[in-house]
């Protein structure tokens, strides 16, 4: 494993990370989707699963890649909802084991593999859909990642991402230290490649067409604000403090996306793109 793979796997294998996701987000590793009728995080997470599944528009015959599958929450939901063939890929060995354990009662069940979704062993034109839920910040080379998604998609295949953009180009020195912290301690090697417009630009340069962005910011921010509130006792720990590496998620919640949103430097978007039908693998 290289530095990038080790850094991401180490973050998600850390007790404070996976235990926090389990207790606070119900094993999900993404924000919830809040409406005027949503009362709690559990409902928001269920909303997110439904909303994202609706946007995917899967057919039972589709072969689907969950790129950065975490503990397999979305993969299991999609198999149950659509009957599609879903393969989850993660570079964290622990997540493969947990995902397989949580899916063993299912028929059919999603399949999980260990690997880096930026450099896979899948054949050309293998998948109908590739989706991502908040893991592009771990992609060290965003352009290479989009090229890989393009390679493994069939002509007419689609990408759907629920992820954020951060305007790192206009951050203060203090905010830049938070970006440094994400890279050093949370595997955020791609976060500075998520400036406004950069993900869509990477999709376009990879060859995708019909690229769209839908703003989900206001629907997901209650989760980020909630995480910030829960981390308030740790707000005094700055990202460059010696104690910070021992409280990674708390520091991220205190000084990360909620505060960047208030500064106008954070948006959460649903990205879509299609591989043209005319393409044929070289």
Where do the language-model regions lie?
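Class I SAM-dependent methyltransferase SAM/SAH-binding core
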Residues: 65, 74-119
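C-terminal lobe and adjacent flexible extensions of AdoMet/dcAdoMet transferase-like proteins
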Residues: 248-282
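A short acidic, Gly/Pro-enriched loop at the edge of an enzyme's catalytic core
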Residues: 118-129
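Short alpha-helix
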Residues: 191-207
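N-terminal auxiliary segments of SAM/dcSAM-dependent transferases
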Residues: 1-21
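A short glycine-rich, Lys/Arg-flanked "PGG" loop and its adjoining helix->strand segment in the class I
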Residues: 143-158
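Short, glycine-/aromatic-enriched active-site segment of Class I SAM-dependent methyltransferases
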Residues: 165-190
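C-terminal helical/coil "lid" or tail adjacent to the Rossmann-like core of SAM-dependent
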Residues: 217-262
